[in-house]
Amino acid sequence: MKPIPILVICPRQIDYFNCQTIPDPETYEFHFLDAPLELSGFSRNFDLMAYLEECRQYIRQYDIKVVLATRDVPSLLQAQLSQEFKNLQGASVESAFLCLHKYYTHKLIDPTPIDYAVWKLDTDRALSEYLEEIKIPFPWMVKPCTTACSSSIVKVNNSKEALDAISIYQDIIVDNLSYLSPFLQTYLDSKQYPLIDSNPILVEEYINFPYKCCVDGCVSNGKIVIWGISDSHYFMSKPECFADFTFPSTLPESIQAKLNRAYKEILQRLIEYGFDNQFVDVEFFVSHKGEIKVMEINGRMIPISASLYRQCLNQGDPYTALIQIGMGCQPKTPTLNGLVGGIFYITTFGKDIAENLLDFEIAKSIHNLEIRVTPEEKITEIGASGFPLATVNLVGNSYEEINQQANSLRRQLLKQPEFSPWN
């Protein structure tokens, strides 16, 4: 049987690895079309419209049957391509956009949104004018509306910190996110979504709930399939710095059932906007009493979870499932096999070139570790969440076992421990 030609757009390192190690690899013929897109979603030189045309030509030339997008911005491209090519499956551009754009997620998809507001960046505007618009009491969580991977998030406790954050955003956001505008203005209605003509910053009330988790799954021909729930953990000394997420969740069954119901309600709203044939994960805050609030929605799979799902689930490989969806087949609901796993972040608060912060020699020798920087890359912008240099996937028989492994690896890999998240 001839292998299925599959195009992976804007691939990251982990996509190459996951496609090479996919079950039954002889079934597929993977093609990769690289792009100058950072994990954060930032880019100074990415011509999105030219890349989209390159995708069209590639699909025709190689008779591509499935297009895989495992990142936030590429999910928009995959959605548009699925509208243009009859043999491709995917979501509508509008529904993919509503997952990406955090302001419109709250406005149109989140059933019970937290308090939120938005700033439209303008370099000619006095900084003090921004503060007058926000009626939310401090503290705030502030973030660009269209970045990924928890990038450029800042916790703001007072007016001075708010002004500092705005000043930083004015310096970096316009240059790094403007590449999105031509695509959004072409395929969306600017009267319906006026923020696509600006570089907006989301301001949210700070939610001090003790638990954070993620419900992951997909929509296939209009049917919702839940993959599972993972727990997110943050460093106690730096509560905005993401430490890891572990799978499966240890939350009580009653709360997990409530999360699954909330997930399905959100996906039904997305389906009304045309969301289909794609993975989607929803991140939630969870209180001691079981109250839940939406953090954000990601309209794509979690590629770093693939190895974890493959080891902790029966029939749980998300790449295989996404290909099945792309071929018009509904994937089976996976089941737990008794193992536990986690994705652990190797994060720094240091500012230096990456090779002075991370031991690349050790990192390259570790199985299931994704390096997120190049040795010569300069790390200069550090928000409240720190800067993730790498992630490592660990699986074992207990959470205690994998946490001990992760703590040991962090201490081996970080060259400047004084800037580590646990200090």
What are these regions (language model features)?
Residues 324-369:
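A glycine-rich beta-turn/hairpin centered on an aromatic-Pro dipeptide
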Residues 139-159:
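Conserved anion/nucleotide-ligand pocket segment
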Residues 96-115, 129:
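Glycine-/Pro-rich loop/turn segments that contact NAD(P) or position catalytic residues
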Residues 205-269, 274-275, 298-321, 326:
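ATP-dependent carboxylate/phosphate-activation module, predominantly the ATP-grasp catalytic core
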Residues 139, 159-208, 266-272:
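Conserved ATP-binding module of the ATP-grasp superfamily
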Residues 1-98, 125-129, 328, 348, ...:
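ATP-binding N-terminal substructure of ATP-dependent carboxylate-amine bond-forming enzymes
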Residues 273-288, 422:
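A short glycine-rich, hydrophobically flanked beta-strand micro-motif that places a catalytic Asp/Glu
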